[in-house]
C-alpha cells in the first residue's frame, strides 16, 4: 500500500437497508434558493419549503452523506426520505423536536 492509496471493493454498497422510506413532493414557495443537506431533519427545513410536514418527522433525505438537494424558487421536487436510525433523538436544527422522535410520530 502506498501513502494515501485507496483500496476499494468491487461489490455494490447498500445504504439504509431495512429502514422505512417515503417519497414526497416539496415546493419552494420562497424567493430564495434553499439547500437541504443529507442528514438535516426534513421536518424542520425552511418554512418556505411546502409539504406535509407531519409525515416527515424523524426522516432525512435518502441521498449519500455530505450531499444536498437544492430547491430554487418555485421548484417542485419529489424526494425520497429515510428514517433516522440509532436512538432517534433529535436536537437543534430549528428546535421543533428537541427530544425523542418516536414519541412524536402518528
Swiss-Prot record:
It holds the Pfam family Urease_beta. It is found in: Cytoplasm. Gene3D superfamilies: Urease, beta subunit. GO terms for biological process: urea catabolic process. InterPro entries: Urease_beta-like (IPR002019), Urease_betasu_sf (IPR036461), Urease_subunit (IPR050069). Pathway: Nitrogen metabolism; urea degradation; CO(2) and NH(3) from urea (urease route): step 1/1. Its EC number is 3.5.1.5. Keywords: Cytoplasm, Hydrolase. It catalyses: urea + 2 H2O + H(+) = hydrogencarbonate + 2 NH4(+). It is an enzyme of class 3 (hydrolase). One of its GO terms (cellular component) is urease complex. One of its GO terms (molecular function) is urease activity. Heterotrimer of UreA (gamma), UreB (beta) and UreC (alpha) subunits. Three heterotrimers associate to form the active enzyme. Belongs to the urease beta subunit family. HAMAP family: Urease_beta. This is Urease subunit beta. The gene is ureB.
Amino acid at each position: 500500500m502506498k501513502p494515501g492509496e485507496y483500496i476499494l471493493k468491487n461489490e455494490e454498497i447498500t445504504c439504509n437497508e431495512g429502514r422505512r422510506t417515503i417519497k414526497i413532493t416539496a415546493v419552494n414557495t420562497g424567493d430564495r434558493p434553499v439547500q437541504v443537506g443529507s442528514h438535516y431533519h426534513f421536518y424542520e427545513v425552511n418554512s418556505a419549503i411546502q409539504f406535509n410536514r407531519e409525515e416527515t418527522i424523524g426522516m432525512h433525505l435518502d441521498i449519500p452523506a455530505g450531499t444536498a438537494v437544492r430547491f430554487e424558487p418555485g421548484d417542485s421536487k419529489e424526494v425520497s426520505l429515510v428514517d433516522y436510525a440509532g436512538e432517534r433523538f433529535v436536537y437543534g436544527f430549528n428546535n421543533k423536536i428537541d427530544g425523542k422522535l418516536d414519541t412524536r410520530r402518528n
